[in-house]
Amino acid sequence: MTVDEFDQFVMLPENADRLLEYIGGEVIEVVSNQRASALASRFIGFVQLYLMQNRIGFVTGADGGYMIAGERYIPDGAFVSKTRQTEPSEQAYSAIPPDLVIEVLSPSNTPHEMRVKVVNYLSVGVTVWVADPDRKLVEVYTPGQPVKKVGIGGLLDGGDILPGFAIAVKDIFDV
């Protein structure tokens, strides 16, 4: 299936309630579980609280899609700065990539799919936070830098993207 065929496919009425990604020429249905969903909501909630005090952009949840490097992704959460996009798009998949993506690993994520997504996000300048509930750590992927692993005793900071944002990793996993 081509990306154009995918774009038509997701707009069919029977697909209206499905979360679909286009990765490596394949249609992947996003399937999560309650644990991953709760962690993603909690993680996004911390970013949202920060944004209430620092009105520098907006967050999208697990149904906000993005066009990334010719593919279509639906991250668990994403932050888009006002300098990149002033308000959320009404398109199913925004053509403007986010500044930051939050992914929470769940049993349906294959290591290959996640690697492809991270590489493609990085290729368009997106920072990626991958939360691993089993290992209780967050991997931070920043364009042009080595991966940083922040464990349960560490502090995750927003760097240049979310200046002044900091959260104890243990608080992310304390559900």
Predicted features and spans:
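Gly/Pro/Ser/Thr-rich low-complexity, intrinsically disordered segments predominantly at protein N-termini
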Residues: M1-V175
